[in-house]
């Protein structure tokens, strides 16, 4: 179970890093919000799912 928890924490950190870099770059592009909103919504949805997954797995570890 700890391997799954550690993997999900690593995935959360990786997704967070990608969003921190990707969101400003996507919004600064010439088309900005209109062309990148689906990608941004997908990334944010994946991040929220990862946060809940880490929380659920943490309840089994602690």
Curated annotation (Swiss-Prot):
Its main location: plastid. The keyword Chloroplast applies. One of its GO terms (biological process) is photosystem II stabilization. The chain crosses the membrane at residues 8-28, 41-61. One of its GO terms (cellular component) is chloroplast thylakoid membrane. Keywords: Chloroplast, Membrane, Photosynthesis, Photosystem II, Plastid, Reaction center, Thylakoid, Transmembrane, Transmembrane helix. It is found in: Plastid, Chloroplast thylakoid membrane. It holds the Pfam family Ycf9. It is a multi-pass membrane protein. The keyword Glycoprotein does not apply. Gene3D superfamilies: Photosystem II PsbZ, reaction centre. InterPro entries: PSII_PsbZ, PSII_PsbZ_sf. HAMAP family: PSII_PsbZ. PSII is composed of 1 copy each of membrane proteins PsbA, PsbB, PsbC, PsbD, PsbE, PsbF, PsbH, PsbI, PsbJ, PsbK, PsbL, PsbM, PsbT, PsbY, PsbZ, Psb30/Ycf12, at least 3 peripheral proteins of the oxygen-evolving complex and a large number of cofactors. It forms dimeric complexes. NCBIfam families: PS_II_psbZ. May control the interaction of photosystem II (PSII) cores with the light-harvesting antenna, regulates electron flow through the 2 photosystem reaction centers. PSII is a light-driven water plastoquinone oxidoreductase, using light energy to abstract electrons from H(2)O, generating a proton gradient subsequently used for ATP formation. Belongs to the PsbZ family. This is Photosystem II reaction center protein Z.
